[in-house]
Amino acid sequence: MRHNKKFNHLGRTASHRSAMLSNMACSLIKHKRITTTVAKAKALKKFVEPLITKSKEDTTNSRRVVFSNLQDKIAVTELFKEISVKIADRPGGYTRIIKTGNRLGDNAEMCFIELVDYNENMAKEKVAKKATRTRRSKKSAEAAAPAAVEAPATEEPKAESAE
């Protein structure tokens, strides 16, 4: 049975796990995207999202709470100065996990974990796809309209000749 197993231990002691998650969170905040295994990324997502939410209000207490988890002044400063401003209107879901396949050495499932608002490449692709879709739909709609007009005209004489 699965009672009282709320999080993945990742095969580590509690101190090792907390240190690893703290270091990974600092790397994510500094670099905006890191490559890791899927299990670690899911654990990191649970660890870092409440910290990002806490950074939305820039008070002394919230800075102390975040620093107690991260232990890195540069990461805390960047989180409160840059990231919290950029994600101010987002209600949650600050990170995204993108699976990249399996690692060659041990066949572990790998992925990127990144901050959602910092991936300009995906935002540009989405805009370009929308523009392409609207162009195609206009052309297909224009092509379908004349075909629809011609089709009833050809059907009417057939209906008259059949009667």
UniProtKB/Swiss-Prot annotation:
GO terms for biological process: translation. Keywords: Ribonucleoprotein, Ribosomal protein. Gene3D superfamilies: Ribosomal protein L17 (3.90.1030.10). Pfam families: Ribosomal_L17 (PF01196). One of its GO terms (cellular component) is cytosolic large ribosomal subunit. PROSITE patterns: RIBOSOMAL_L17. Residues 127-163 are annotated as: Disordered. One of its GO terms (molecular function) is structural constituent of ribosome. InterPro entries: Ribosomal_bL17, Ribosomal_bL17_CS, Ribosomal_bL17_sf. Residues 142-154 have a biased composition (Low complexity). Residues 129-138 have a biased composition (Basic residues). Belongs to the bacterial ribosomal protein bL17 family. Part of the 50S ribosomal subunit. Contacts protein L32. This is Large ribosomal subunit protein bL17. The gene is rplQ.
